[in-house]
């Protein structure tokens, strides 16, 4: 029998305004990975400072999002879940879950069978549920690769499905959708080498821009000094800017990064900050609002420091990020690109896929085993502490989310709510 709290969630799930304390998309409002709140713990373990811990139906690298007293999260079941044999790929399903923020109970679970054929044997650390949902307060939108883009109401009822491409890739699909006014923006680089805008109410395609290659991140929105909004993607060798209203290509900037781009760029005051690449990494800042090839006019700086997976944090004129493999964290001067510090964390979080979050002046770097190292967000490295879940032997590939004074961290097995 459903508890009163769950019944309340169902009865009131008719839409609400996004609050400042909500975390409505990948990396929170504006995709900046930051919260102005305070009180999030800086220490925890499997036995301390855990408000609740909920077993998940299956693994995933997607992040939780929040809307009021609800959490939305994806996972997959039926195939290659890391428990026992791989199973039959025809049994693959992706799930959108709704959980109660107060106690972690699963309110509803909507499963979507995969559209065959599907990519077999995607590595377990990437899997089939890597895209983070997004909400506008009335609906929840998810991207499940070639299976499609979906809209659900807040009770888990499917409202529409849209097809953005059918190409497969051995790394799977990972980009998270974002919302701009009435548009749902989807980076379908894997599925069709395109950036697609859908009408969020109907799922109908509004525009499509091609030529987006080797790009694995959420689209980034930037406002120019003239007040115009552009949508930006970083891809192999280039950063591209498009008119968000019609998808018209506006500008491109050569990066010198000759491999794929995974980290989501951050934007501030008309400037796009991007890091990425695999071997070698790189980073740059480019001013939006140009036309054509802006490499010689709008590129502000370029460095040979970057990271392959986690996205950066921009805070008080500095860009912070972690190398995914080396245990090294960086602080760059956001105006010049000059290295302020480049130091190895001790204790080491291990390999990092999760993007950091900034809360109350602290940056949280979460390693894939389950150890989080907390540092001060200042231009001199100061380690404040570390906290570990699952004996640092788990599978934590997702970026944390902030819910008021609590931190939400998911592994392949559990969703944790950390705080009092």
Positions of the model-derived regions?
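Bacterial N-terminal signal peptides
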Residues: 1-11
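Noncatalytic, solvent-exposed loop/strand surfaces
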Residues: 13-420
């Amino acid at each position: 029998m459903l508890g009163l709290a769950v019944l309340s969630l169902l009865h009131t799930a008719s839409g609400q305004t996004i609050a400042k304390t909500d975390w409505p998309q990948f990396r929170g409002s504006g995709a900046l990975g930051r919260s102005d709140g305070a009180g999030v713990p800086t220490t925890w373990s499997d036995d301390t400072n855990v408000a609740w811990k909920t077993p998940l139906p299956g693994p995933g690298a997607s992040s939780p999002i929040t809307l009021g007293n609800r959490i939305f999260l994806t996972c997959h079941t039926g195939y290659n879940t890391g428990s026992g044999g791989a199973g039959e790929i025809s049994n693959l399903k992706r799930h959108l879950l709704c959980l109660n923020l107060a106690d972690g109970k699963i309110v509803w679970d909507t499963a979507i069978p995969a559209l065959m054929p599907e990519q077999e044997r995607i590595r377990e650390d990437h899997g089939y549920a890597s895209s983070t949902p997004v909400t506008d307060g009335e609906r929840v939108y998810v991207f499940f690769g070639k299976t499609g883009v979906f809209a659900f109401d807040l009770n888990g009822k499917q409202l529409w499905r849209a097809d953005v491409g059918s190409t497969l890739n051995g790394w799977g699909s990972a980009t998270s959708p974002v919302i701009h006014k009435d548009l749902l923006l989807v980076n379908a680089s894997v599925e069709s080498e395109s950036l697609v805008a859908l009408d969020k109410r109907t799922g109908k395609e509004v525009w499509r821009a091609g030529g987006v290659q080797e790009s694995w991140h959420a689209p980034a929105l930037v406002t120019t000094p003239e007040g115009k909004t552009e949508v930006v993607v970083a891809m192999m060798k280039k950063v591209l800017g498009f008119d968000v209203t019609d998808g018209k290509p506006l500008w491109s900037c050569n990066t010198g990064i000759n491999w794929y781009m995974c980290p989501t760029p951050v934007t501030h005051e008309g400037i796009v900050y991007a890091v990425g690449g695999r071997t070698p990494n790189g980073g740059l800042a480019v001013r939006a609002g140009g036309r054509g090839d802006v490499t010689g006019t709008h590129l502000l700086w370029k460095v040979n420091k970057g990271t392959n997976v986690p996205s950066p944090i921009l805070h008080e004129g500095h860009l912070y990020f972690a190398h995914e493999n080396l245990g090294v964290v960086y602080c760059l001067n956001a105006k010049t690109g000059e290295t302020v510090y480049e130091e190895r964390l001790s204790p080491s979080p291990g390999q990092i896929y999760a993007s950091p979050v900034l809360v109350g002046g602290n940056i949280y770097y979460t390693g894939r085993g389950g150890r989080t190292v907390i540092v001060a967000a200042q231009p001199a490295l100061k380690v404040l502490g570390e906290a570990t879940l699952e004996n640092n032997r788990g599978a934590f590939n997702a970026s944390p989310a902030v819910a008021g004074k609590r931190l939400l961290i998911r592994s392949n097995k559990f969703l944790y709510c950390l705080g009092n």
